[in-house]
Amino acid sequence: MKLSNTRIAVVLGLFALTFAALQFSQTVREKPIKQPLSGFPVTIGDWKFARKSFFSAPVIDMLGVADYISYDYIEGNGGWLNLYISYFTAVGVTGGYHSPQNCLPGGGWNIASVEDVPLARGGQIKKVIVQKGGEQQVVLYWFQNRGRIIASEYWEKIYLVLDAVFKQRRDGSFIRIIGQVPRGGDREKFIQEMLDFAGQTVDLAAQFIPGA
């Protein structure tokens, strides 16, 4: 795969920023979560909690998450969503994110489109459409870190280094929502419902995740 000059420049810039962080950041403070994610609301708008999933101890150790939830929500029209929130006290020190592309559904699902989309409350998040045969899923994700809502992996890394240097902080969270488009349903309407859910999630997560 051929890399564009822009992408090469970004990667080199990230290396330079990382080097600067290592040179000038003497200490990075681990930032505890405000309150356990287990208290995350079980009702968000029209969506009601259905069940929760858990990682095995080895997976938790591998990820280095300080806290996480994986909740399924359903609504009256048969819609289904999975909300995953992971929190790290010091990304790259106590644990860290995997590439969001690795967190997308596998098992024969193929990426159909990727784009940044705005939220009505402000800010942008990533929207990915994946498909398998006649089925489609919508994946929304973003980084909610130190008071910012970030869609781009590159900008997340840049802010991570800058905040390590100037604030001695590397705490952050990765949030992902997966929804199954109902067969025969209105995909655009369903996506809008997911975006509304995401906007509410941003505001609710701020009650748990440390801000700026």
Language-model segments: residues:
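Generic detector of ordered secondary-structure context
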Residues: G39-F40, V65, K167, E193
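A generic secondary-structure signal marking the coil-to-beta-strand transition
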Residues: G45, G79, D171-S173
